[in-house]
């Protein structure tokens, strides 16, 4: 097993996750099995109770793990399925050690950060690195570990010490450290400054880790003189200084690393069992990046949500929209609309914001209402849903978005004026959305219906069934406490709101479609968590197709992706060029 540790310096949020994912991508393109671990030095057990404003979205895994959004990057880039133990937090490791102490495993010893916490970290990493994450079930050969935060943070000290010891435990030829640092370029001088990187590497080396690669994040490509300066002061060769400058799309980052000889370096440094050959998977990334840069037509989607001021709150939703837009050869324009701005109360208090929000909504090609919690902004979302329904605008509601679509339909079509979710109005006489039986009140963490669940299609001719390739069932990830009241199903269906997908027991409403509408769909699950760049999520893909007016034509042609549209580079084909000529997204004609 080979371990690659990715650390960060100067500031957080400079793209360690994308760089770690890109390193995994180029290694996977060489035919290796790659897994990933994200370490977050906060004391929370998991990301389940985080505010989206503070930490971005909560990413949900197959096993129901609520984890950091960086694990979403790993899954999308590498097309793997991770588990909750691939996200290690200070809280998890302390809980693990304290539980062992309570059981008497330490035989009365004084339990300390060193050696007990640091040993537990190393054991966790070595154990988790061996868990298969690919569909073929084979054991990984490389584990990419991202240490969150920045070097020098007091929270990350136990992890730095653990990896200082770890590099000797697994031997130098099996361990490599990539340090990601910022090279700022003040506009006043236009000169690239290396001092922050020098200080960051000096601090890391003082803690016992010496970087093998220094990855410099910068606005523009590094000058040769700057590269040589970093090489001299950071104790690395010039070819070990890697420049990752701002690029048009993140699809270019793996290509950027490949061009600078990162694979050749790993080949020598870690003695990896790979051959120098043309790599099909990277060709697919290059093809995607080139397509992305050549897009001319634009499709605009109004994202009506509660957390629109911080785009990371909807990271996977945005990625799913981007994947689908690329598949239909359109640039994506997302119009972020704070749902409270659409409410009548805003018209009285801030009329300019109200009219600007409605202007954005009316000018969009399609409307998306994503998941969320809490009553604030729900009436604005209902207003947007009502507008999309009446104006025949393509609409997709995800989780809360689906629930509010049912509330809107109940109020404005069935005439139940007080129809609501019991989450917002426990005393409503028409509880169209109710608390779930699985929910255990009183404890915030882990009380929802989480993880991958199966949904069965109830009819042969629904739009969603066709988008999923005319299959009998689908498996998607869930994260919700409330659901559509099954008692009211008949009343809603009689008026044209069809529940075309239900759970295995037939008790939970999973997919809803409105008759006589170009595309009005609600899903209780979160399809964005399984969207991939080459395999866009069917609900989002349907929304984009409908938004550009091509859905009917696509449904007539049949909806299967090419079997070659996968990430696997272990197909045994000796002709990557022939595969690349067949790389095609879902077939869309220009009419």
Curated annotation (Swiss-Prot):
Question: What regulation of activity is recorded for this protein?
Answer: Activated by GTP and inhibited by CTP.
Q: Which residues form the active site?
A: 399, 526, 528
This protein's pathway reads: Pyrimidine metabolism; CTP biosynthesis via de novo pathway; CTP from UDP: step 2/2
Q: Which UniProt keywords apply?
A: Acetylation, ATP-binding, Cytoplasm, Glutamine amidotransferase, Immunity, Ligase, Nucleotide-binding, Phosphoprotein, Pyrimidine biosynthesis
**Modification sites for N6-acetyllysine:** 100
What range(s) does the Glutamine amidotransferase type-1 domain occupy? 300-554
Listed under catalytic activity are: UTP + L-glutamine + ATP + H2O = CTP + L-glutamate + ADP + phosphate + 2 H(+)
Q: Which InterPro entries match?
A: Class_I_gatase-like, CTP_synthase, CTP_synthase_N, GATASE, GATase1_CTP_Synthase, P-loop_NTPase
Q: Give the Gene Ontology MF terms in alphabetical order.
A: ATP binding; CTP synthase activity; identical protein binding
Q: Where is the composition biased (Low complexity)?
A: 569-578
Q: What is its EC number?
A: 6.3.4.2
Localization recorded for this chain is: Cytoplasm, Cytosol
Its family remark reads: Belongs to the CTP synthase family.
| Protein's name according to its UniProt entry | CTP synthase 1
